[in-house]
C-alpha cells in the first residue's frame, strides 16, 4: 500500500506547487455563483494530479470535483479535490489545500492532505498511524464541549446554508469557540491532529472529506457520514475526537 501513498504524496506536492505559484497571479474565473467560485486553476490542478496518478496506475479511476476519468466501477478509485478552499484562494486568503484519497472496493485506504502555504502534509493509510510532516499525531482528548473548538461548514447553496446555520448557532453558545474556515479538508485534518475537537457540516461532497476521513479515524477519532436525501451526492458529516459530547 505504501506505493499508493507515495504516489498520492508526489501528486499532492506537485499540485500544491502549482497552486502556490499561481496564488498571487491574476486568476481566470470559469464560473461565479452566489456562494462559490470555479477557477481555471482548479481544472489545471486536477489535470496535473490525474496525469501523475494514472500514469502510474492506468487501470485506476479518478473521481474529482472537476470531473471523472476512467471506469468508476473500478476496484481502485482516486477521490480528489485539487483545490479545497477555492473562494479563500481567489480572495488571497492563504487557507486552502490539496486533498487526495484512494478507495479500494469502496473503502478509503489512503489519504493525503497538503497545505502548500504552511508546508503541512498530512498522510494516512489503513492500519497505520497517520503523520504530519513525518510525525505521528492523534486527535485531542477534550470531552467537555465548553472547552472545545468546533468547526462548522456553511456549504454553498441556500438550502444547505439554512441547514448549517442552526448547527452553528448551537455550537456558538455551547463551545469555547467556533470557526468557519472555508476548507472542509483542512477542517478534517485539524480534527485529526487535535487542533479542532469536531467538524460539522450539512451538504458536503465526498471529495471534500475522503482523505480527511481516514486521517481522523486512524488518529483515533470518529467520522459519521450520512447521504442526504434532498441532494444527490451530498452528505452530512460529524467528525470528532470520539470522546466529546456534542449533544446532537
Report the location of each language-model feature.
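N-terminal subdomain of lithium-sensitive/metallo-dependent phosphomonoesterases centered on the IMPase/IPPase/PAP
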Residues: 1-83
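Residue-level signal for inorganic ion chemistry
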Residues: 19, 42, 53, 86, ...
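Solvent-exposed alpha-helices and their adjacent loops that cap or buttress functional pockets
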Residues: 30, 70-72, 105, 141-144, ...
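Short acidic/glycine-enriched loop/turn segments that link adjacent beta-strands
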Residues: 35, 118, 231-234
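Acidic active-site catalytic centers that drive phospho-/nucleotidyl reactions
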Residues: 42, 65, 81-84, 88, ...
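DPxDG-like acidic metal-binding loop motif
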Residues: 72-131
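An extended, acidic
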Residues: 138-248
Amino acid at each position: 500500500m505504501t506505493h499508493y501513498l507515495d504516489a498520492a504524496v508526489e501528486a499532492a506536492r506537485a499540485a500544491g506547487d502549482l497552486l502556490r505559484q499561481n496564488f498571487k497571479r491574476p486568476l481566470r474565473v470559469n464560473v461565479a455563483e452566489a456562494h462559490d467560485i470555479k477557477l481555471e486553476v482548479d481544472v489545471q490542478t486536477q489535470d496535473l494530479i490525474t496525469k501523475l496518478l494514472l500514469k502510474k496506475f492506468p487501470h485506476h479511476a479518478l473521481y474529482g470535483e472537476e470531473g471523472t476519468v476512467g471506469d468508476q466501477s473500478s476496484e481502485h478509485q482516486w477521490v480528489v479535490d485539487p483545490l479545497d478552499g477555492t473562494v479563500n484562494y481567489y480572495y488571497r486568503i492563504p487557507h486552502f489545500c490539496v486533498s487526495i484519497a484512494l478507495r479500494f472496493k469502496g473503502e478509503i485506504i489512503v489519504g493525503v492532505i497538503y497545505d502548500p502555504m504552511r508546508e503541512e502534509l498530512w498522510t494516512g493509510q489503513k492500519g497505520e498511524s497517520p503523520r504530519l510532516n513525518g510525525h505521528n499525531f492523534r486527535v485531542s482528548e477534550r470531552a467537555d464541549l465548553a472547552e472545545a473548538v468546533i468547526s462548522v461548514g456553511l456549504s454553498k447553496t441556500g438550502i444547505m446554508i439554512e441547514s448549517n446555520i442552526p448547527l452553528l448557532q448551537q455550537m456558538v453558545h455551547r463551545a469555547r469557540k467556533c470557526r468557519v474556515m472555508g476548507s472542509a479538508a483542512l477542517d478534517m485534518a485539524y480534527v485529526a491532529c487535535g487542533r479542532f475537537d469536531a467538524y460539522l457540516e450539512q451538504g458536503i461532497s465526498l471529495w471534500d472529506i475522503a482523505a480527511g476521513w481516514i486521517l481522523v479515524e486512524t488518529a483515533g477519532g470518529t467520522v459519521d457520514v450520512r447521504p442526504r436525501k434532498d441532494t444527490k451526492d451530498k452528505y452530512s458529516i460529524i467528525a470528532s475526537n470520539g470522546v466529546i459530547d456534542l449533544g446532537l
